[in-house]
């Protein structure tokens, strides 16, 4: 009998011992994954929160990784004096377990277990395995339960059987499987309690008749050790190009991007209007509280990225200016991480995807109401990012795109972002600070891009 046949959800003793087999492998493998959020902090602890055998040879795990407290840790994960081991994350893993690694799955290899219930077996990332990906889709096609896992679907949408899967290779904070160029399944990696906004928001917008966002077709979630969304299946747009690729193509060809930017501004406004109808609108943002939160994030980022420290006094002025400027539009549900990589263009129309928000922020914050200026600032920063991908830098290209985007937004909304200079500068500054911390942790070669914006925002005020 294969050893994995012993790993049933009811086998509490075996499940409790599973980390004996996996802990050493995962300590090495997890920090190398693009979606692992703790790259700048050492993995100090691993704990199995939940284990379910989806089918023989495929284990679904929720694993908690412990890290030193971020407030006591340097950028490269070296605990500062007095550091406490108190923070961590929960990750979703689908692991294949076989005696030998299937052919063609070298990239999926995690390692061979030497101890515990999996001793002598090869462990790999099952999302790379065609058979595992097909069986996962079958679970979604036939709603039901497997241990604490719940598979659910929109009964009005038919998902055909036998769609060939392929795992997308793009850099992202989750893993995505495309099935037959008809559907895409996003498997969330970092799991937090509650309904993931990438399920909640597209579902609500579909109810509003908003065609800018692909609607959920099926999804799966867990009830143990807490209720949480694990993955969402949506229609796939096979002929679409993301905004980042299109913008870089325009730059390479020496073309403008203003028409597309204006239409993108209109699409953003339409999504914001639909969000304001689908979810309760909050009060006008309290600028004092917003300024305090932005300043706190700035101080934390400067602690981790020394290059930021000389600009802190100038950046604080952008946040202090909130105390005397127009409060702007009411707070509402927003995208939360809007940039050119989060929009698709197909058939001359823009679509908005990935409503998770910034994954590093708590889920409760990402699901709360915020100023729509935050999304606008994110997109304006993205035009600057694109313009800086070529030498020499094309500041006029970025300026024209920013202007066109805001004009398009104003044409659909009842207010003009260009008239909210103080708000826009503060949110752009906050976004640039986030970018500095992100790039320093994940892509150090890109750090000069947001640092150039930091200098502009701190010295010249926008």
Locations of regions flagged by a protein language model:
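Short Lys/Arg-enriched alpha/beta "domain-start" segment
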Residues: 4-48
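An alpha-helical support segment within catalytic cores of ATP-dependent transferases
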Residues: 150-163, 298-334
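ATP/Mg2+ or Mg2+-diphosphate-binding catalytic cores
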Residues: 396, 400-418, 422, 426-462
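Conserved catalytic-loop position in the HRD/HxD motif
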Residues: 337
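Conserved ATP-binding subdomain of kinase catalytic cores across diverse folds
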Residues: 67-295, 299, 348-349, 356-391, ...
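Active-site catalytic-loop/activation-segment of kinase and kinase-like phosphoryl-transfer enzymes
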Residues: 283-321, 400-410, 437
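Pre-DFG segment of protein kinase catalytic domains
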Residues: 333, 351-354
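Conserved protein kinase catalytic/activation segment
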Residues: 342-352
């Amino acid at each position: 009998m294969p050893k994995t046949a012993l790993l049933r959800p009811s086998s509490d003793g075996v499940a409790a011992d599973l980390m004996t087999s996996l802990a050493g492998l995962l300590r090495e493998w997890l920090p190398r994954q693009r979606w692992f959020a703790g790259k700048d902090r050492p993995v100090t602890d691993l704990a199995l929160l939940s284990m379910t055998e989806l089918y023989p040879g495929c284990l679904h795990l929720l694993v908690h990784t412990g890290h030193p407290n971020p407030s006591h840790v340097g950028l490269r994960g070296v605990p500062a004096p007095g550091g406490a081991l108190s923070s961590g994350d929960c990750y979703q893993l689908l692991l294949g377990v076989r005696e030998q690694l299937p052919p063609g799955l070298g990239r999926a290899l995690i390692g061979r277990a030497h101890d515990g219930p999996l001793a002598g077996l090869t462990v790999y990332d099952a999302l790379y395995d065609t058979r595992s990906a097909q069986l996962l889709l079958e679970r979604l096609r036939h709603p039901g339960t497997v241990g604490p896992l719940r598979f659910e679907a929109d009964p009005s949408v038919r998902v055909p059987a036998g769609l060939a899967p392929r795992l997308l290779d793009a850099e992202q904070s989750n893993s995505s499987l495309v099935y037959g160029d008809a559907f895409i399944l996003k498997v969330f990696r970092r799991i937090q309690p509650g309904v993931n906004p990438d399920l909640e928001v597209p579902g609500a917008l579909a109810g509003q008749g908003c065609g800018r966002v692909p609607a959920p077709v099926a999804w799966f979630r867990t009830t143990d050790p807490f209720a949480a969304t694990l993955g969402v299946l949506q229609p796939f747009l096979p002929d679409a190009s993301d905004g980042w690729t299109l913008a870089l193509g325009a730059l390479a060809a020496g073309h403008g991007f203003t028409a597309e930017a204006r239409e993108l501004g209109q699409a953003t406004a339409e999504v914001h209007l639909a969000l304001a109808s689908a979810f309760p609108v909050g009060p006008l943002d309290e600028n004092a509280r917003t300024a305090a939160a932005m300043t706190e994030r700035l101080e934390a980022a400067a602690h981790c990225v020394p290059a930021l420290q000389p600009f802190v006094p100038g950046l604080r002025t952008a946040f202090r200016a909130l105390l005397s400027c127009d409060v702007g539009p009411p707070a509402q549900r927003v995208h939360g991480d809007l940039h050119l990589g989060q929009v698709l263009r197909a058939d001359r129309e823009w679509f908005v995807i990935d409503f998770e928000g910034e994954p590093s922020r708590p889920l409760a914050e990402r699901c709360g109401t915020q100023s729509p200026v935050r999304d606008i600032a994110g997109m304006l920063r993205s035009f600057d990012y694109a313009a800086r991908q070529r030498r020499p830098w094309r500041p006029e290209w970025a300026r024209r795109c920013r202007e066109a985007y805001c004009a398009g937004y104003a044409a659909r909304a009842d207010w003009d972002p260009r008239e909210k200079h103080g708000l826009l500068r503060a949110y752009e500054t906050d976004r640039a600070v986030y970018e500095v911390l992100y790039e320093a942790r994940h892509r150090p070669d890109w750090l000069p891009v947001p640092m150039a914006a930091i200098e502009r925002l701190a010295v010249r005020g926008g």
